């Protein structure tokens, strides 16, 4: 059995889950996640109903939890750095059974061959799906001839503390690139943040 210890924000948890589970399935191993999370001190927004972790949002994933690592397990720790030649670790693909895997494993290359499975694993609760579908229909009815571009402004505590905030020039240049590539198409930008809030100003 391969056990994945999840850590940090929800996006990191999702990548680790999808990547490590895909590795385990590809090798014919059982897969579980550890009930204990790492580094939960820098949290973004927390939904009143669903919280901010994989196991609080996805009921089926919560069923894959174990509370402790059995004796005799090896530990594999991801070692991707800015100087790494690839975003995929060959060592991660070669782990043996009975291993605890630590890290984020942020690369779709680990699971692109299982994309349909990943979409099923992360199927949202029905009430979220219903609310989303209503919003999308409303937008399509209001802008029937437009293309939609979703923009995620990373501005939460973890980004500010670690110095990862991007300047306004980055976002303006990105928006200009989208508009330049779709000159004949009306583009509607859908803006959202790491925290639930309204857009208060545009720069």
Predicted regions mapped to residue ranges:
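Extreme N-terminal starter segment of soluble prokaryotic enzymes
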Residues: 1-3
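Short beta-strand segments
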Residues: 33-35, 150-152, 188-193
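A short beta-strand-loop structural module common to alpha/beta enzyme folds
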Residues: 27-40
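Donor-binding and catalytic core of enzymes assembling or modifying cell-surface/extracellular glycoconjugates
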Residues: 10, 183-203
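Short, flexible loop/turn elements at secondary-structure junctions
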Residues: 8-9, 37, 155-157, 193-195
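Histidine-anchored nucleotide/phosphate-binding helix
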Residues: 13-25, 171-180
